[in-house]
Regions:
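N-proximal, solvent-exposed amphipathic alpha-helical segments enriched in charged/polar residues
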Residues: 1-28
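Residue-level signature of catalytic and energy-coupling elements of molecular machines
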Residues: 9, 25, 97, 108, ...
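Conserved catalytic-core segment of NTP-binding enzymes
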Residues: 11, 49, 53-56, 208-209, ...
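Extreme N-terminal, non-catalytic leader segments
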Residues: 21-24, 31, 41-45, 49-104
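C-terminal boundary of histidine-terminating zinc-finger modules
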Residues: 315-325
Length: 343
């Protein structure tokens, strides 16, 4: 539903852009069966707020048959933006969910999302009830990795999100909310509201684990989540290269400031196993070990690089659903079992 609403809002043109890309749409959510839209309009356009509101209501009525719409308009002041960003740090448990685990990395390209997806599916294979929250607004990958492209989040009769399901897990991803390839320009308050709706107004049911796949680094997605949800811990994904350690250090220190426990470090693409069974460190070595010793955080496992691991991910098939065919793949399965033990 939200995906279609934003599509309509993008058609509301202002000069050569639209109200979404201009950052005027602050919040969009349902409350008591009424659609509420909060707009932040710059001073030079504030006198046209009634006209803009009427255009929005007409468009939503004609294209989506929405009748109950309330539009709240405020002038966009710099001081308002500063106040809005001061969200109260009071994380809560999500009803029915026993453990909430975040998967994070210092930079992109380390296989974080692939590990998060396979961990979730591996837990489900062990008969745990599992949910998966793809928190990467700018580059959601669950659509591809979990083969749910084109599936949108549906809304229940009591205005709750219904997760998409595949591979035995319940999935909420921005790939099921936003159009593919459309840039997202959100400020902290928008993140906070949308994340709050998705975390607390989704029909998760009773879960043993909710796995959250964070975007790389430390930004609004991580901050909003830690302000809203009481996490049981974070797993940090890195690679053996020492050149990437500074990014990981920043990520670890950021989560410590947010008072979130670091469960351990997973070193991905650590080595390859050749046809003779010999280990070859093609991307360097000891990156995860250095971090483990520096921060006194467990190095949970080292995951070898395997071509089929990557190929299956590109085709929407989690690696753990297949039987291992060689020593490298056996070690990968063992690594995910090791992570399951840690959480």
């Amino acid at each position: 539903m939200l995906k279609e609403i934003y599509k309509v809002l993008k058609d509301i043109k202002i000069d050569s852009s639209n109200i979404v890309e201009l950052g005027w749409v602050s919040e969009v959510f349902f409350e008591n069966e009424k659609l509420k839209i909060f707009l932040r309009i710059p001073k030079e356009y504030i006198n046209y707020s009634n006209e803009i509101s009427n255009v929005i209501k007409t468009a939503l009525k004609e294209k989506m048959n929405l009748e109950k719409i309330e539009i709240i308009v405020k002038e966009k002041f710099e001081k308002d933006q500063k106040v809005e960003q001061k969200n109260i740090f009071n994380p809560q448990r999500i009803e029915g969910i026993k453990k909430i685990i975040g998967i994070a990395s210092g930079k992109g390209g380390v296989g974080k999302s692939t590990i998060a997806v396979n961990l979730a599916v591996r837990l489900a294979q062990k008969n745990y009830k599992v949910g998966f929250f793809d928190a990467d607004v700018y580059g959601p990958s669950a659509g591809t990795l979990l083969n749910i492209k084109g599936q949108v989040l549906k809304i229940s009769q009591d205005n709750k999100f219904i997760p998409v399901e595949n591979y035995g897990i319940k999935i909420v991803s921005f790939s099921s909310l936003l159009d593919e390839g459309v840039p997202v320009i959100w400020r902290g308050t928008m993140f906070h509201k949308v994340f709050s709706d998705l975390f607390f107004n989704t029909l998760w049911g009773n879960l043993d684990y909710l796995i959250i796949d964070f975007p790389p680094g430390t930004g609004d997605a991580q901050i909003s989540t830690c302000q809203l949800v009481k996490l049981d811990g974070i797993i940090i994904i890195t690679t053996p290269q020492k050149i990437s350690l500074d990014d990981v250090r920043r990520t670890i220190n950021a989560f410590k400031k947010l008072e979130v426990r670091i469960i351990g470090i997973v070193e991905n693409m650590s080595y390859i196993i050749d046809t003779c069974g010999k280990r070859i460190d093609i991307f360097g070595k000891d990156g995860g070990k250095i971090l483990s010793e520096e921060f006194n955080i467990p190095l949970i496992c080292q995951i070898p690089l395997d071509v089929e691991f990557l190929e299956l991910a590109d085709n929407g098939i989690p690696f753990v659903v297949n039987k291992p065919k060689n020593n490298s793949q056996i070690e990968i399965i063992k690594a995910f079992d090791r992570i399951c033990e840690f959480i």
